[in-house]
Swiss-Prot record:
One of its GO terms (cellular component) is plasma membrane. This is Interleukin-1 receptor accessory protein. Glycans are attached at N57, N107, N111, N118, N196, N209, N299. GO terms for molecular function: interleukin-1 receptor activity; NAD+ nucleosidase activity, cyclic ADP-ribose generating. Residues 21-367 are extracellular. The lineage of its organism: Eukaryota, Metazoa, Chordata, Craniata, Vertebrata. Residues 549-570 are annotated as: Disordered. It comes from Macaca mulatta. Gene3D superfamilies: Immunoglobulins (2.60.40.10), Toll/interleukin-1 receptor homology (TIR) domain (3.40.50.10140). The gene is IL1RAP.
Amino acid sequence: MTLLWCVVSLYFYGILQSDASERCDDWGLDTMRQIQVFEDEPARIKCPLFEHFLKFNYSTAHSAGLTLIWYWTRQDRDLEEPINFRLPENRISKEKDVLWFRPTLLNDTGNYTCMLRNTTYCSKVAFPLEVVQKDSCFNSPMKLPVHKLYIEYGIQRITCPNVDGYFPSSVKPTITWYMGCYKIQNFNNVIPEGMNLSFLIAFISNNGNYTCVVTYPENGRTFHLTRTLTVKVVGSPKNAVPPVIHSPNDHVVYEKEPGEELLIPCTVYFSFLMDSRNEVWWTIDGKKPDDIPIDVTINESISHSRTEDETRTQILSIKKVTSEDLKRSYVCHARSAKGEVAKAATVKQKVPAPRYTVELACGFGATVLLVVILIVVYHVYWLEMVLFYRAHFGTDETILDGKEYDIYVSYARNAEEEEFVLLTLRGVLENEFGYKLCIFDRDSLPGGIVTDETLSFIQKSRRLLVVLSPNYVLQGTQALLELKAGLENMASQGNINVILVQYKAVKETKVKELKRAKTVLTVIKWKGEKSKYPQGRFWKQLQVAMPVKKSPRRSSSDEQGLSYSSLKNV
C-alpha cells in the first residue's frame, strides 16, 4: 500500500511539475531563512511565501482555490520528492501553512519547498532546514539570538523565544532555566518566572548563554523545546552622552613640510545607544573628500568596550602634501542619536629651523675635547693640584690644636728600618718639607716607662706614620703597641690620622688591627730608587696625607741632618 502511494504521488507530482515548469514563479532558495532545530524536538515551520513574498495570507489563497503543496530535497541530493505525511504517529504533518515535525530526526535535514498553485497560477520558495544535535551544556552550532540588557538599570527580563503555537493556552508547560551548564536557582540577582527570566540588576558578570527548556504534554506524549539565547550587558541610556571627539584636539598641531605624508586621526567615542546609527566623516574646506581634487585616503577602524561603547577612528591620509593642502580646513564630524559634534584639526606648514650643523658640530667637538683634556690633566696631575690648593687656600691645621709634633713615626726596631726612618724619611720631611717628626728612640728621655711615653707622644702628634715591613707585624713589639694606640685614638677621638707607608711587602698577617687598617686606609708604597726624589709621586702622596702647615719650608741643607743631596748615597 505504501509503495502504491509513493508511485501515485510521484506520478501526479511529475504531472504538476511538467504543467507548471514554464509558468511557476520560483523565488529560489531563501538562505536568509535558514531554520535550525534540535534533534528529537518538535518543530513548526510556516511557509515563507505568506510572510515575505506574497501580499495575501493563506486563508485568502485557500478561498481563491489555491492549494499549498510541500516537498523536499534531502541533504547532499538533487532530486526533489514529496513529503511523506503518513509516517507513524503523524511525525510529519501539515496544518494550513505550517509544516509540523513531532519530533525531528537528523535525517530530516534538507531543503524544503512550499508551492502555492492552481491551474493558472503557481508560486514557490525553498528554505533550508538543519537538524542539529545538542550536548549536556546545550552547546550547538546554532546561531544564537542576542538579547541586550542595560547595565545597572533596574529590573529587566528576557523571554523564552520561539515557543508560540506549539501548545494551546490551556496547557501549562514546565520551564527550566539554565546559565551555561548550571540550573538557575538561588541566584542573587536572576530569578526564573515561568517563560520569563528576571534580572533584578544587570552586571557584566551576567553576560553569557541562557537556555530555557519547555516541557509540555500532547496526545499522551511529552515533548521538550530547547531555546538558547545570548545575554549581553551594555551601557545604560542614563549614562549616554553625545559623541566625544578625542582627536583632533587643541593640544596637537600637525606640522608638515611640502612633500611629506599628512596623517590626521579622528578618534570618536560613542556611548552605547540601542539602534543608534553612529557616523564619523571628514570634510575638507567644507566639502566631502571625494569632491576635492587631491589624493585623499581614509581608513576606519572600530573597537568596542565590554559594555558595547564604541570607539571609531578614521585616519585621513595625504601621501605627498602640498603647501596648498596645508592651508586647507580639515574638520572631523561625528553623529549619533544623542547629537552631532565637529572638531577642526590644526594643520600648518613647518618652518625649517636654521641649520647650524657645522657650528654645532665644532662646538660639541671642542667641548668634548676640553672635557677629555681636563680629565686627563686631573688624572695625571691631581696630586699637584691638591698640593697647590693646600699651599694657597688650605687652612693651617697646626694653629691652636695643642699638638707638639706633626708626625709620630712607628717602625720596626732593626738596622734597615731605622736607617730608612732616620736618614730618608726624617731627612726629607724635616729638612725639605719642614715637618716636625717625633721618633721615639731619638726624642724619648732615658729611664721613662715605654708604654706611657709612647701613648704620650702619640697624643701630642697630628699624624701616626706607620712604616710597614715584615718585621713590623711580629707580636709583642713596641711597633704594634704604637699601631694599636693610634688606631684606637683615631676611632674614638678622631684627633689623629694614621698614614701607612709600605717599606717592604708584608705577607698575609694575623694582626687584626693591621688588617683593618689596610682595608680602610690608603697604603703609600716605597719603590726604592724611584721614590728617593723629593718631588716624586711617593713624596707628593705623603704630603697630601700630612697636616696643612703655612710655615715656610726649611731650605738649608745642613740644618738638623741630611738634605736631599745626601740621599743619593743612602
